[in-house]
Amino acid sequence: MKIIDGKKVSNEVLDEIKLAVQNRKKLNLKIPHLAAVLVGDDGPSQTYVNSKIRACERVGFESSLFQFDKSITENELISEIEKINVNDDIDGFIVQLPLPKGINQENILNKVLPKKDVDGFNPINYGKMALGIETFLPATPAGIIELIKRYSIDLKGKKCLVIGRSQIVGRPISILLSQNKIFGNATVTVAHSRSNNLKEICLDSDMIISAIGIPEFIKEDMIKPGSIIIDVGICRVKDDNSLKGYRIVGDVDFDSVYDKVSLITPVPGGVGPMTISMLLKNTLRASSLND
């Protein structure tokens, strides 16, 4: 089987979380509570938050949405976050990104209490991750790691290329895969918009993790036979044959590379579903740490 089925693995993780919640109920322990902070009325952000709320319902979590008008000031938003920090009923919360112009994202994420930072973006948690200390991992990299574990992918000594250096995916996954852990020990290269000879680097890589958001950028002639492809990108491209007028694709030209790879994540249905399930797994851990 060539497909790394993120939807299947995500469902397995959610079922495990649901069972853990049921066991907590039997022990009269607190039900995990995840909150989301949403600023403005950005359509995709609203969709992402709604999907997280539905996932909470599925596993038996409590959930809350704190939605604010895009006119909110940075200081006002910080004040609201500090209220959530001291709300003992909420185990973890996320600040949905991106934030509107005029609000400094770094300042906001710095204000999220580390023990409630289930997105793993607070500098304290980010630093722990870099040092290999157990903490909340950013959800998308955590999802990639979970797929690597469940598909028994051995990266020891393998050449792994990460394309993209964002704080959300590229940087953290490059750090994690280089660590001396069961899922790591890879020889990691990070490529980005200023990298030269990208095709040559790709052809020399045993695994490629692409997180650049350029539709179908990775072609068949850029990968070596038997490589593993983790496609984090998700884009809409025009498709007159679709009822919606578009189709969803990733960074990788799936059809052209399929016969050449050993394993590949599809888009949709690959990394995407894992992000929400790992966010909930972090929230379960946050709740357990409060017992």
Model-flagged regions — what are they?
Residues 56-70, 184-190:
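Short beta-strand elements in bilobed, periplasmic/extracellular small-molecule ligand-binding domains
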Residues 97, 212, 232-233:
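Glycine-rich, N-terminal phosphate-binding loop of Rossmann-like dinucleotide-binding domains
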Residues 1-28:
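Positively charged, low-complexity intrinsically disordered leader regions
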Residues 95-160, 201:
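Anion-binding alpha/beta catalytic cores of soluble intermediary-metabolism enzymes, centered on
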Residues 39-53, 135-228, 237, 244-255:
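Glycine-rich phosphate/diphosphate-binding loop of Rossmann-like nucleotide-binding domains
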Residues 76-88:
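Short, well-structured alpha-helical segments in soluble
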Residues 31-40:
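Short beta-strand segments enriched in small/hydrophobic residues
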Residues 105-122, 126, 230-290:
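Rossmann-fold NAD(P)-binding glycine/threonine-rich loop
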